[in-house]
Swiss-Prot record:
Residues with glycosylation annotation: N5
InterPro entries in alphabetical order: GPCR_Rhodpsn (IPR000276), GPCR_Rhodpsn_7TM (IPR017452), Olfact_rcpt (IPR000725)
Family: Belongs to the G-protein coupled receptor 1 family.
One example GO MF annotation: odorant binding
Record topology, Cytoplasmic segments: 47-54, 121-139, 218-237, 293-314
Organism: Homo sapiens
Disulfide cysteine pairs (residue numbers): C97-C189
Name of the protein: Olfactory receptor 8D4
Keyword Glycoprotein tagged: yes
Membrane topology recorded in Swiss-Prot or TrEMBL: Multi-pass membrane protein
Length: 314
């Protein structure tokens, strides 16, 4: 017999980023712009990598996978947030909230492991360049990406199952702009000890495991770079990692400030500011960081644009 959910709440109300009426339209325009840049940037990155044979390498395979993940991630959160800026009705059904929570967990956890996989790829490329194509074969890359999404899916099932067993019999106002674990736990009228423990244990394990992988990879990378005698060679080697390192620092910084603490100790403002960074801003910046600081991507983009112009009539 399945676990019975004693919830009497059939829908939730999202409070949004702010309740000030005069800010709704400016915020709608701002986040619509961010979402547009995110979608166009990530889909463009995927297209550039797919259409240019010179970019069919392990590094760009992971980058296109990250772009796909960021596109899905932003589409889970932003459309509902945008509708909340324009509509007076900010309600979301119980099932809709659980679905959004599930896919959010899949995306945010997968993002951590994708960044760790990309760090491993850079480690092999710089520390074992002669064996790079052998170690990071297409099969290995595909298995790594599949493992990334599998871990995200498994953890989302665990968190989602724990939230489903909670009772919601009081207020149905989620003081957030999307259905996140911490605000939902605060609404529950049943014991949330297990849920808070799982957030800390599983979330802590995911962040420690992935961040340690990244730190160890970059420790070996830095050691290898320092062994390069020429300054030009060191700069070239480090330039292949700088974009990824920037993305890692931004993502993990905002994520750790949100989840690696008891839910009761976080302020509403802090939660929303942290969430805006890792659910919207960073997803927009990722394709810009990787393209603007990568000569191969810039050259491939210019090549595609010149081809489009030459094929256009007139």
């Amino acid at each position: 017999m399945g676990v019975k959910n004693h919830s009497t709440v059939t829908e939730f109300l999202l409070s949004g980023l702010t309740e000030q009426a005069e800010l709704q339209l400016p915020l709608f325009c701002l986040f619509l712009g961010i979402y547009t840049v995110t979608v166009v940037g990530n889909l463009s990155m995927i297209s550039i990598i797919r259409l240019n044979r010179q970019l069919h390498t392990p590094m760009y395979y992971f980058l296109s996978s990250l772009s796909f993940l960021d596109f899905c991630y932003s589409s889970v959160i932003t459309p509902k947030m945008l509708s909340g800026f324009l509509c007076r009705d900010r309600s979301i059904s119980y099932s809709g909230c659980m679905i959004q929570l599930f896919f959010f967990c899949v995306c945010v956890i997968s993002e951590c492991y994708m960044l760790a996989a990309m760090a491993c790829d850079r480690y092999v490329a710089i520390c074992s360049p002669l064996l790079y194509r052998v170690i990071m074969s297409p099969r290995v890359c595909s298995l790594l990406v599949a493992a990334v999404f599998s871990v995200g899916f498994t953890d989302a099932v665990i968190h989602g199952g724990c939230i489903l067993r909670l009772s919601f019999c009081g207020s149905n106002i989620i003081k957030h702009y999307f259905c996140d674990i911490v605000p939902l736990i605060k609404l529950s009228c049943s014991s949330t000890y297990i849920d808070e423990l799982l957030i800390f244990v599983i979330g802590g394990f995911n962040m420690v495991a992935t961040s340690l992988t990244i730190i160890i990879s970059y420790a070996f990378i830095l050691t290898s770079i320092l062994r390069i005698h020429s300054k030009k060679g060191r700069c070239k080697a480090f330039s292949t990692c700088s974009s990824h390192l920037t993305a890692v620092l931004m993502f993990y910084g905002s994520l750790m400030s949100m989840y690696l603490k008891p839910a009761s100790s976080s302020s509403l403002t802090q939660e929303k500011v942290s969430s805006v960074f890792y659910t919207t801003v960073i997803l927009m910046l990722n394709p810009l960081i990787y393209s603007l600081r990568n000569n191969e991507v810039r050259n491939a983009l210019m090549k595609l644009l010149r081809r489009k112009i030459s094929l256009s009539p007139g």
